[in-house]
Amino acid sequence: MKVTTIIAALLSVAVVDAQNNAQCRKLGLPCHATKTIPYVVKKGDTLTHIAHDIYKRKVGICDLAYTNHIGKNPNLIYAGQTLLIPTDCKTIDDGSCL
């Protein structure tokens, strides 16, 4: 009985994890993030500064660019603009968009 309970618990965790990953992909979140938090851009901010200094390299420059649909110039952001910051990134992308 204990083995069955443990197996059932492990399977339910695997199903929930798969559903979360599918939901994140559906939302278009990079780095296998599970959610986002808002950040209001300040004068002089760049994606590099936000990713490396403010969020201590817990998110990549390109993760920010992809999440916020920033085009060819990943540092083209404006003071007052609200960016979504992916949280709980499993991998960090600092180069694919540059």
Curated annotation (Swiss-Prot):
Protein's name in the database? Secreted LysM effector Mgx1LysM
Its keywords, alphabetically, are: Cell wall, Disulfide bond, Secreted, Signal
What the record says about family reads: Belongs to the secreted LysM effector family.
Q: What is known of its domains?
A: The LysM (lysin motif) domains are small globular domains involved in binding chitin in eukaryotes. Mgx1LysM contains one LysM domain.
Q: Which organism is it from?
A: Zymoseptoria tritici (strain ST99CH_3D7)
Its subunit composition reads: Forms homodimers in a chitin-independent manner through interactions at the N-termini of Mgx1LysM monomers. Homodimers are further polymerized in a chitin-dependent manner.
Cite the SMART domains for this sequence: LysM (SM00257)
Example GO CC term: the record gives:
extracellular region
Please give the superkingdom of this protein's source. Eukaryota
Indicate where this protein resides in the cell. Answer: Secreted; Secreted, Cell wall
Effect of a null allele: Produces no to only a few pycnidia.
Q: Which interval of the chain is the signal sequence?
A: 1-18
Record's note on what induces expression: Expression is up-regulated during wheat colonization.
Q: What does this protein do?
A: Secreted effector that enables the plant pathogenic fungus to manipulate host defenses for successful infection. Binds chitin and suppresses the chitin-induced reactive oxygen species (ROS) burst. Chitin-induced polymerization of homodimers forms a contiguous Mg1LysM highly oligomeric super-complexe that is anchored to the chitin in the fungal cell wall to prevent hydrolysis by host chitinases.
Question: Any extra detail in the entry?
Answer: In plants, chitin acts as a microbe-associated molecular pattern (MAMP) that is recognized by lysin motif (LysM)-containing plant cell surface-localized pattern recognition receptors (PRRs) that activate a plethora of downstream immune responses.
Q: In this protein, which residues make up the domain named LysM?
A: 37-85
| Positions of disulphide bridges | 31-89, 62-97
Which InterPro entries does the entry mention?
LysM_dom (IPR018392), LysM_dom_sf (IPR036779)
The entry's chitin-binding residues are 44, 48, 75, 77
